[in-house]
Structure formats: structure tokens, C-alpha cells
Amino acid sequence: MIKKALIFCSILWAANAMMWGQTATVKPLTIGEVRTFKSKTLHEDRTLNIYLPQGFDKTKSYPVIYLLDGSINEDFIHVSGLVQFFNEMYSMPETIVVGIANVDRKRDFTFHTDLKDLQKDFPTAGHSDKFIAFLEKELKPYIESQFKTTEKYIFGQSLGGLVTTEILLKKPEMFDNYFIISPSLWWDDESLLKQAGTLLSKSHDTKKFVYVSVGKGEHPVMVKDAEEWYDVLKKSNKKNWTVEYKMMEADNHATILHRSLYEGLVKKFPYQEPK
């Protein structure tokens, strides 16, 4: 009996030795590029996280998503995964994602306010005009010099949704598709929302896709403002604009982004049989 046990232990030891003796080849998992862009407008370096489709071909043209809050530890990884999934399972074409890493989102995503309490709570705020100029005059031309591009998208949530709304109202020609998630339209006593109808009346009726979403579990002011913003968009009667709205029943401000973008992309790109 003891002899059998010793034989079994010897076999087990030999098997373990073989297993631990095996080697594996290790190499980086690469989904794109990290670039440092020197902005003259913002007087600082900005990190760009760029997702390139599998089999990227520099001779081909691709849509581009400009993703706010696009740091590696923010939204870049999971949004790039959504884009890859929608290319595989839906009718979304292969798409480049440009994640714009934050330096100071309160500074970049808010416009000037004279409200003293906001100035106190957000001392660096109020410079979205410079950030928008950076996007328009520097970043977009740079990306278009590096890649052949087609449609342009912008994704923004919270304060990112505020500046995305500001761009749509003041410089709508900058992008073709606007995904506006939980926009912080409360900023500056809702002044942008109050101007929205007038600003929309001045914009051209060129083809656009606009998606607005908010979580049912968010602050009541966020919900009210998002619903009013959607109403203003619908009443603008832009015949060439597709305007979609989604109340995310199970989400709050912290949980909404991924599921909401999924729902927005479903509205933009219908399901197709897997390739």
C-alpha cells in the first residue's frame, strides 16, 4: 500500500514539474496608439488615446469618434470595446476612436459664469471656448492629416455633455453625430438651455444624428433639463436631423454611460446578422 502511494506521489510530482516547466510567449496586447499633442490654444500637452480597427488600412477612410473623458482609466477602453462590438454585430462601419484625456474637465467643459457660488466651487471653470477652439482648429485638422476620415462623432457625458450641447448649438458643423449623455445643463442657472431654441433657429438644416439620454435615478434637475432639451430639439423641426431620446430606467449619473451609449448606437445602427 505504501509502495502504491509512493508511486502515485511520484507521478503527481512529475506531472507538476512538467506543467511548471512549460513556457509561454508574452507580447503586448495593442488596440491602438497613445500620442502626445502639443496644443498652442491650450498651452499644454494633451494625451490622445487612439483606437484603430482591427486590420486598419491607412489607405481607407474611416468615421472618427471624438471621446471626451477619454483617458485610459476613464472611458476609452470600454467605449472602444462597444465600437468593436457594434462593428461585428450591427451595421456600424469600422471606426476610429480618439479618446481625449483630461487635464481639467471643469475648465474645459464649462463656459463662463457670473454666478459667485459656481465661481467659488469651480475656481478654474469657464474656458470651454478655448477647448472648443482646440477641437476645431487643432485636434480635428491634426487627426484628418493623420487618417483618412468620413463622418465625425462626439461623445460626452455630464460636463462633457454640457460642452457637447454647446458645440451643437454654437458650432453644429463641427460634427455629424452628437451623443449627449446626462448633460449638466444646470450650469449657470440653465442659461444654455434657455438660449437653445434661439441658437437652433440660426443653424443650418444639414444632416445630423443627435442622441440625448438621462438616467431615471439622477437628480430631478438633470432629468428635467434633459427632457426639456429633447423637447427643444424636436420643436426645432430640422427635417434633416434625426433626434433620439432615451430615459435609462435603471441608471443613475454614475452608471449610465456604457448602457446609454449602447442604446444610442442601437438607434443609429440596426442589427445585422454576424459576418
Locate the predicted segments by residue.
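C-terminal catalytic histidine-bearing segment of alpha/beta-hydrolase fold enzymes
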Residues: 219-275
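Alpha/beta-hydrolase fold nucleophile elbow
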Residues: 147-158, 178
